[in-house]
Amino acid sequence: MTLIKSISGIRGTVGGAQAENLTPPDVVKFTTAYARLIAERNPGKKLTIVVGRDARISGEMVSDLVEGTLLACGADVINVGLCTTPGTEMAVVTKRADGGIIITASHNPRQWNALKLLNSDGEFLTDAEGKRVLAMAEEEGFEYPGVDGIGHVLSREPFNRTHIEQVLALPLVDVEAVRKRRFKVVVDAVNSVGGIVMPELLRRLGCEVVELNCDPTGEFAHNPEPLPENLTGIAETIRREKADLGIVVDPDVDRLALVSEDGSMFVEEYTLVAVADYILSKNPGGDTVSNLSSSRALRDVTERHGGKYSASAVGEVNVVAKMKETGAVIGGEGNGGVIYPELHYGRDALVGTALFLTWLAHKGMTMTQLRATYPSYFASKNKIELTPAIDVDKVLREIKERYSGENVNDIDGVKIDFAQNWVHLRKSNTEPIIRVYTEAKSMAEADALAQRFIGEIKEICNI
């Protein structure tokens, strides 16, 4: 069974048994529930919903199902076709729509797809809204409108160029400074929608572009998650081409990974750190936000600029809520997700790229030189599998009590901040697992801290 239902939408492998995988009836059921939620929030209004997708092989099929279902529910549709996740989010706002559905499984393998659900601000649904959709999906007896109430497709126009124009128009994107540096950039778009937008954005910034996996066929050339073990190809190409840097995006282009001129990883955590350094240089004393599992380096850089750092629960919707609460000038997640409120409240690899290249141009440094200006931390990510009979919440409470004298945050699992390192323990919502994230000044220290807490969990569980 691979159909995973959550407050942000549903995802699963395409085909197989209904209610156990992502099948046509499941797509129809959850799209109908979403349309009902939006109608409930807008009584008596003729709804308009934006639909966009990444380049997955199943994308067009799922998009057709979503579009047809929305029309059957009486909603009008603006279909932006092949579009990035941030682009679809921005289209909702630009087109003044009532919501949006993004068809993408992000960094998951090619057999997966998903529906991500947006509100009228082009942001992910709140926890309460997501739960309402899940509840509505299980209700029976919904009556669809008659033939005169069917919606219409208002347009089928790409939004990618508009997205690029809006990024380049930002006051802190210094197009001329980047053009003067004439960066040579290798870009790996894993044969998804990034292959359409990233080369064009880079060329508009005056870069010489070497394209790698930029044909949007949906046949991912490697594991689509932008982790170091999946990026050996671009590292080799950078060295061979004597490029200044490499840019890697995931299939829906909300995550940005950077590779230095020597083929070494800039490290995803430091995408946000570097962009924040630039934004804070223009907004001294500004606040920042990332999630609890993100690097301490962002806090260090924020405090260097006289600002205040805040942490949210994991998940884009939680980061955005905390950013709005604190008035943060920049934020995001440590997986390369940059959220710049001056454009929109969503992770966006295009704005991340433009702001990063501006900073690199202003600094007059190489990638490795810039990376060396930031505090160096090492992260270890582990998990411990438990039996279904074990009360995971009770285990986490025990850990929290043991370390009550330390700086403990329990808004999302349990995070313990020590003077030189930290550990974050999170339970899975779909399986009996505790994820163990640690960060320290060396890899050996991070690994040792993880093993220490894995040992404590085993002791508590008597395993």
Each language-model region and where it sits:
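An N-terminal, well-structured beta->alpha segment
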Residues: 1-68, 72-73, 153-185
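Short glycine-centered, acidic/aromatic-flanked micro-motifs in structured strand/loop junctions
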Residues: 51-53, 187-189, 260, 342, ...
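Proline/glycine-rich low-complexity loops and linkers
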Residues: 131-165, 169, 260-334, 339
